[in-house]
């Protein structure tokens, strides 16, 4: 469960290490984002020679949450931390590699590229 001012790790090779959620997209009163939701983020920590710079604003999709996601069979998939993958204006991933597992809930038309790049799908 991600809200405004939440800090997330970055799970791709764009050069960003940590980001801050500045807006949850999808309606004016929308408060929380879960796995598969798109948010606006500001880069807070970045590698010196990365593709992105500190202070830049990007869209991102949430790929892991510590709160977890409930499946239809009753199981709950949780992670140790919150993570996101940075997206361009067309909602395509900027990075060419994904680090760590992602959930099956990302298997929609929009984010199949992220699922195919991920080393493990839970």
Curated annotation (Swiss-Prot):
List the GO molecular function terms: large ribosomal subunit rRNA binding; structural constituent of ribosome
Tell me the function of this protein: Binds to 23S rRNA. Forms part of two intersubunit bridges in the 70S ribosome.
Protein name listed in UniProt:
Large ribosomal subunit protein uL14
Q: Any keyword Ribosomal protein?
A: yes
Write down the Gene3D superfamilies for this protein, in alphabetical order.
Answer: Ribosomal protein L14 (2.40.150.20)
Which domain of life does the UniProt lineage start with?
Bacteria
Q: Which UniProt keywords apply?
A: Ribonucleoprotein, Ribosomal protein, RNA-binding, rRNA-binding
Q: Which GO terms describe its biological process?
A: translation
């Amino acid at each position: 469960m991600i809200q405004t001012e939440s800090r997330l790790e970055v799970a791709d090779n764009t050069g960003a290490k940590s980001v801050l959620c500045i807006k949850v997209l999808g309606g004016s009163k929308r408060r929380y984002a879960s796995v598969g939701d798109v948010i606006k983020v500001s880069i807070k920590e970045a590698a010196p020679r990365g593709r992105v710079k500190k202070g830049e604003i990007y869209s991102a999709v949430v790929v892991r949450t510590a709160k977890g996601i409930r499946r239809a069979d009753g199981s709950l998939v949780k992670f140790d931390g919150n993570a996101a993958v940075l997206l361009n204006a067309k909602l395509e991933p900027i990075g060419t590699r994904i680090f760590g597992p992602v959930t099956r809930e990302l298997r929609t038309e929009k984010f199949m590229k992220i699922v195919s790049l991920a080393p493990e799908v839970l």
